[in-house]
């Protein structure tokens, strides 16, 4: 299968070389964590002398004997080379029970630069502080962005065609190897079902998957809608699915921990405080929705909103849903001292639709940038101080358009 260098992620790892931290590569299943690790190993071998690379891949039967943490520890120590910079890479580390005991011991010796990846359900962001006694840095890997998708296909189609395809295929690049739509959908659906019906069931000892699956499908079908565990519980109960808001709240957390969804909380712009009552959920990859639900209730405005949310997260922004009086701002994106207010729409050619998007932004009185992202087909232009951007241009050139 063809691969492309994921420069942004690779540069981030390069910048962390030889820092005194455990580097933990996380992300949804099949997002490219293992390939990224291999690319970094090759970079080290190509550019540095006097290095010693110790690589363990627990998906490879050659390392089956190391699935016991004492054996793992002894194997690494035996391969340490005095006088060289020693780099330790462990792929699918969760396949060694109690792996953290070996990793923590090796880290404490201060003689290895350690990098690990693991299955999304067993190496959760929420668990890292508990697992590792030393410092760690998380490198979170997302599925392909639209820009990476275009690079993969060498931009040999017009942008309009590439964009239409991306809204269906999404960014799980393993699916690109298949020539038919059915095979691509089956691949993505298998990735999704492995997480929901195997990884999460095993991780949390869930008695059955019906509630979890119906919850996940509900969230997919309601991307960009504010919701809460109580609302979802009531809806499922009406469909004769026995559950309660406590269970739904836990299951939502599990799905987010495994990076199937990202939860986006509300922010009161006027009161400058975060609101807890309801939130929105966005899929980690838009291709999952099409693979699981097909075109049912397909709303491109919501699809575009999901794409914009993911792009903001990829770029390191903290993302919130804005509330201003009774109005809603799709996204308030913050990164350090930066802040951007963003509205997303599929089509703003109708005056009424355009007004619905810009009116809330005009009520915000601070000087931070305010933008509307839509499928305009036009170069960037301004209205009352608001920048209007074509979604394809923004996804490809966001650093130039913000």
Annotate the PLM regions:
Residues 25:
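Hydrophobic anchor at the beta1->P-loop junction of P-loop NTPases
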């Amino acid at each position: 299968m063809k691969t492309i260098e994921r420069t942004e992620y690779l540069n981030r790892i390069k910048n962390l070389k030889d820092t005194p931290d455990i580097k933990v590569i996380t992300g949804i299943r099949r997002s490219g964590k293992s390939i990224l690790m291999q690319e970094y190993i090759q970079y080290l071998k190509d550019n540095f002398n006097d290095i010693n690379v110790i690589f363990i891949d627990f998906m490879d039967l050659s390392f089956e004997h190391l699935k016991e943490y004492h054996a793992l520890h002894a194997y690494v120590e035996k391969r340490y080379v005095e006088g060289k910079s020693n780099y330790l890479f462990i792929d699918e580390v969760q396949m060694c029970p109690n792996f953290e005991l070996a990793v923590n011991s090796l880290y404490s010796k201060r003689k290895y630069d350690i990098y690990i990846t693991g299955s999304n359900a067993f190496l959760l962001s929420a668990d890292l502080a508990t697992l590792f006694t030393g410092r760690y840095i998380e490198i979170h890997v997302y599925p392909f962005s639209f820009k990476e998708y275009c690079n993969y296909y060498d931009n040999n189609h017009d942008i309009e065609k590439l964009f239409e395809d991306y809204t269906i295929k999404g960014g799980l690049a393993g699916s690109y190897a298949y020539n038919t739509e059915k095979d691509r959908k089956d691949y993505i659906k298998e990735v999704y079902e492995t997480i929901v019906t195997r990884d999460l069931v095993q991780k949390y000892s869930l008695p059955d998957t019906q509630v979890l699956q119906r919850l996940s499908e509900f969230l997919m079908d309601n991307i960009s809608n504010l919701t809460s565990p109580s609302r979802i519980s009531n809806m499922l109960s009406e469909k004769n699915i026995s559950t309660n808001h406590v269970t739904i709240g836990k299951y939502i957390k599990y799905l987010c921990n495994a990076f199937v969804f990202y939860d986006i909380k509300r922010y009161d712009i006027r009161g400058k405080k975060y609101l807890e009552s309801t939130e929105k959920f966005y899929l980690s990859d838009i291709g999952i929705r099409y693979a699981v639900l097909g075109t049912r209730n397909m709303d491109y405005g919501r699809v575009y909103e999901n794409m914009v949310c993911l792009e903001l997260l990829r770029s390191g922004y903290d993302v919130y849903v804005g509330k201003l009086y009774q109005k809603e701002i799709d996204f308030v994106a913050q990164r350090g001292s930066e802040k951007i207010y963003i509205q997303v729409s599929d089509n703003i050619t109708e005056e009424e639709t355009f007004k619905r998007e810009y009116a809330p932004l005009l009520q915000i009185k601070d000087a931070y940038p305010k933008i509307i992202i839509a499928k305009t087909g036009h170069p960037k232009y301004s209205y009352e101080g608001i920048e209007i951007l074509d979604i394809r241009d923004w996804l490809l050139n966001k650093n130039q358009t913000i």
